[in-house]
């Protein structure tokens, strides 16, 4: 079999800044993605500037204003302990979108949901690439284990993991990564099975490149489009899962302003005519997930047009 000199020498790669510029142009050209970006950007702004946009702290209590409706003093009302709901939403947005709290005195940038998705991407992409490129018994063994994990309902799997390792921000990250790994691995495997048949992969094999070089330098970058879109969707799913775990009492431990825990604490007062403590965090979760899904849908739609 003959391979052209250009194929053997490899494909000329587009400079990174041009790839970034093209991605930004795709994002900015989509009205759907821009609508989602505005929603997510609003909550990111609220999370970053939480200490400056409210005169209260998330744990400050006013026993004279328990379950108070929205007013000039408390724009979204208060919960059953007299804590300002807007303040708690703002500080909750910090955990959801800005920082990952390790303990009371230490935190790292980038949010709980994103760390979980990134960890799942690393593990899932590695397993998917190895399975697709190596094939045989390795592929069968890895995929059957992941299929067994996917047989569990997602929320049940989250509950099993958190119940086993305990509830904390770091453990929620691990749970998000574990639950997301099978789906990511199957996506990457399907993309890699298609890409590994391309001429430039055969050219790399003829050049004698290391299998890991082929997997992570030749195959993975050419699968990045669908992976990025899937990752954005998974961040939304992870935020929804964090809210569900908080509602079930398995989320971030108190006194964290966990949106799911806020819904759980306020639901008992809905029928008594005080829905505010449950209503606003529910809308916050819904709006954020919708915003992320709009970004992913817009990117997917515009990427298809550019192909």
Predicted regions and their residues:
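Periplasmic/extracellular loop-to-transmembrane helix junction in inner-membrane transport proteins
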Residues: 23-28, 56-114, 264-282
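Generic hydrophobic transmembrane alpha-helix motif, especially the helices
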Residues: 75, 79, 85, 107-110, ...
């Amino acid at each position: 079999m003959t391979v052209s000199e250009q194929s053997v020498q490899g494909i000329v790669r587009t400079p990174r800044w041009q790839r970034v510029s093209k991605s930004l142009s795709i994002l900015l050209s989509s009205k759907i993605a821009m609508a989602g970006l505005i929603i997510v950007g609003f909550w990111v702004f609220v999370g970053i500037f939480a200490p400056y946009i409210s005169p209260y702290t998330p744990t400050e209590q006013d026993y004279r204003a328990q379950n108070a409706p929205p007013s000039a003093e408390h724009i979204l009302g208060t919960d059953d302990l007299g804590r300002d709901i807007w303040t708690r939403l703002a500080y909750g947005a910090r955990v959801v979108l800005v920082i990952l709290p390790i303990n009371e005195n230490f935190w790292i940038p980038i949010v709980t949901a994103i760390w979980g998705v990134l960890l799942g991407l690393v593990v899932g992409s590695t397993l998917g690439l190895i399975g697709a490129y190596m094939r045989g018994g390795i592929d069968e063994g890895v995929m059957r284990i992941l299929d067994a994990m996917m047989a569990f309902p997602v929320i049940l799997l989250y509950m099993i993991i958190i119940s086993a390792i305990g509830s904390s921000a770091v453990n929620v990250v691990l749970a998000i990564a574990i639950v997301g790994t099978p789906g990511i691995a199957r996506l990457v495997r399907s993309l890699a099975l298609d890409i590994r048949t391309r001429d430039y992969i055969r050219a790399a094999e003829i050049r004698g490149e290391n299998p890991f070089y082929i997997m992570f330098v030749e195959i993975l970058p050419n699968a990045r489009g669908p992976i990025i879109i899937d990752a954005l969707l998974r961040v939304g799913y992870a935020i929804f899962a964090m809210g569900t775990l908080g509602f079930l009492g398995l989320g971030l431990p108190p006194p964290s302003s966990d949106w799911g825990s806020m819904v759980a604490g306020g639901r008992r007062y809905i029928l008594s005519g005080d829905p505010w403590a449950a209503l606003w965090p529910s809308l916050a979760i819904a709006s954020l997930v919708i915003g992320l899904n709009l970004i992913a849908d817009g990117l997917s739609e515009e990427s298809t047009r550019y192909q």
